[in-house]
Design a protein with these regions (language model features):
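Membrane-embedded helix-loop-helix hairpins and adjacent transmembrane boundary segments
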Residues: 1-554
Length: 554
């Protein structure tokens, strides 16, 4: 990277850390530290909610997803607006009325202590794992592409976040999230406009989108009923709905964002802001990926975007086979470029058919390389989607923009990780520590909150450092959530809507439901989005069964 890029990157990240630490260094009590003193306005809440959800994985993986498979991933978010409306009508008023610090406090009020501890513990498990992954995912990709030390990157990201989160608490998050969202969105718009401006002179936006459409990259909707297909209209509107309902309604990393609101109305409007803007934001990020695909239709793209995989294959006994495939791929791409540059391409069915034939041939060549990697490099990921956008950034963006886009990725990593640490701290202190050690002073709980923030940050760093022992972690954020969210959501739905069910019924229903969901996940019978729906349904049905059984016995 150029010195200017280093300056832009370091300056941007330093501003976030210093501003968040200095501006919010004074917290008088636990309410200040965990709920920002209930002084947040609606747009601060909205930006904080969006920044929490927008991890580095969003900006690394989503463009690569669109590059490889098109815009269909947008269906994942179709259930979100409906879920947010329900949360605003039913969930937020309950939390506001009870003046809770965490969502799980409500469950003790409705059921009992053990149900509160169970759901809080499920949250701590899944969000504790996710915190490590949100650090590891960008660190592993940046370390491979930039040739930086992985452990150094993990520690750098982790301790930067710990610093302002531990000192400033929720107020620091609300302040930094506004800056981070501005950096992230402006960075993606700049990248999009630069790519459009870099296309050949005779290819305007309309023609570019026609080329993308010819390759199936603009297929937004899939109405098929294939339950194994991860992203369809139906999985998004049902499984995505339940995932969003659980994530925004019961996950403390999101609940804590709107619990800091000045009033019920401010909290509701802040969450509704996310419902309105989330799909357009994801559309923008996916569109960037589609335009990266279009850009590479006029350039020779790497046959595989993971440079570590390519380097190791070239050093192995499969190098001659790889070199032959790479050479054939080079010729195939050149033939495609010649056809695309023809002025009559978009009007000629014959040329389009020839182009699609070459496109299929190129995909087969890429699959052959992935198979070689899978069969010969057990410690290297053959799925290179997550490397597409970062590879484009480093190889084609001008000086200054490289630093800005890397700042986008690191800002996203910091925003999501800081929210996770903040939520893990509040849940640990409010739901576990404070009930165990009651009647301590306010200053004691404030001190312990900072200690637990540091502790969870260290745990996240440790888990991120051992994450290389596992496969495909970059893809697992939503999968991990789906394993736990359905059960937790089922408990909350029963708590709010089915008043006759008592504590023991819901407690044992939740445990059994979670066991069933884990078995279903291991069996790999369904796309992971459906686990959210099944978990909620199992919890509700089992709690009704236990309630009926208990009433008959009585």
């Amino acid at each position: 990277m150029n010195l200017i890029d280093w300056f832009v990157l370091i300056f941007t990240i330093s501003i976030i850390v210093i501003y968040g630490t200095w501006k919010n260094r004074i917290n008088l009590n636990l309410k200040d530290y965990l709920k920002a003193g209930n002084r947040a306005n609606w747009w601060t809440i909205g930006l904080s909610v969006m920044a929490t959800q927008a991890s580095a994985i969003t900006f690394l993986s989503t463009p690569g997803q669109a590059y490889s498979e098109g815009m269909g991933f947008i269906q994942f978010y179709f259930g979100l607006p409906f879920a947010v409306i329900i949360i605003c009508i039913f969930f937020i008023p309950v939390y506001t009325k009870l003046k809770v610090f965490t969502a799980y406090q409500f469950l003790e009020n409705r059921f009992d202590r053990k149900t509160r501890i169970l759901t809080a513990s499920l949250f701590l498990i899944q969000r504790g794992l996710a915190a490590g992954i949100t650090i590891y995912a960008p660190a592993i990709i940046l370390s491979v592409v930039l040739n930086w030390n992985l452990k150094f990157l993990i520690i750098l990201i982790g301790f930067s976040v710990i610093l302002y989160t531990a000192i400033g608490g929720t107020r620091a998050l609300n302040s930094t999230h506004k800056i981070q969202m501005f950096i992230m969105i402006s960075g993606m718009f700049i990248a999009l406009f630069y790519i459009i401006g870099s296309l050949p002179e005779n290819i305007n936006t309309e023609k570019a989108l026609k080329i993308a459409g010819l390759n199936g990259k603009l297929n937004l909707l899939d109405f098929s009923f294939d339950i194994n297909n991860r992203y369809t209209f139906w999985s998004g509107i049902t499984g995505g709905f339940f995932l969003a309902l659980s994530y925004f309604g019961t996950d403390q990393s999101q609940v804590q964002r709107y619990l800091s609101g000045k009033s019920l109305r401010e909290s509701q409007m802040g969450l509704l802001m996310n419902a309105i803007l989330k799909i357009p934001m994801q559309f923008l990020i996916l569109l960037v990926g589609v335009f990266v695909f279009i850009f590479y239709q006029f350039q020779i793209a790497p046959i595989h975007f993971n440079p570590k995989a390519i380097s190791e294959i070239k050093s192995s006994n499969k190098s001659s086979i790889f070199n032959k495939i790479e050479y054939d791929n080079y010729k195939t791409q050149n033939e495609k470029i010649k056809i695309l540059r023809h002025n009559d391409f978009l009007e000629s069915k014959e040329m389009q058919n020839e182009f699609l034939k070459l496109e299929k041939e190129e995909k087969n060549q890429r699959e052959k390389v992935k198979n070689i990697i899978d069969q010969n490099l057990t410690d290297v990921e053959s799925n290179d989607k997550d490397y597409v956008f970062i590879s484009f950034i480093l190889n084609y963006l001008p000086i200054g923009l490289v630093g800005l886009l890397l700042a986008v990725i690191l800002s996203a990593a910091m925003s999501s990780t800081s929210s996770e640490l903040n939520a893990l701290t509040s849940t640990t202190v409010i739901d576990l520590y404070k009930p165990t050690y009651p009647n301590k002073s306010e200053s004691h709980y404030l001190k312990m909150s900072k200690i637990f923030t540091f502790m969870w940050g260290i745990i996240a760093i440790i888990f991120a450092n051992i994450s290389s022992l596992f496969e495909n972690l970059i893809q697992l954020i939503n999968i991990i959530g789906s394993i736990f969210y359905g059960t937790i959501l089922g408990v909350f739905l029963v708590a709010i809507f089915i008043k006759k069910i008592k504590s023991n019924s819901i407690f044992y229903a939740a445990i059994i439901s979670e066991v069933i969901i884990i078995i279903l996940f291991i069996s790999d019978l369904f796309g992971y989005l459906w686990l959210n729906l099944f978990g909620a349904i199992f919890t509700i049905i089992l709690s009704l069964f236990f309630s009926l059984f208990n009433s008959k016995n009585q």
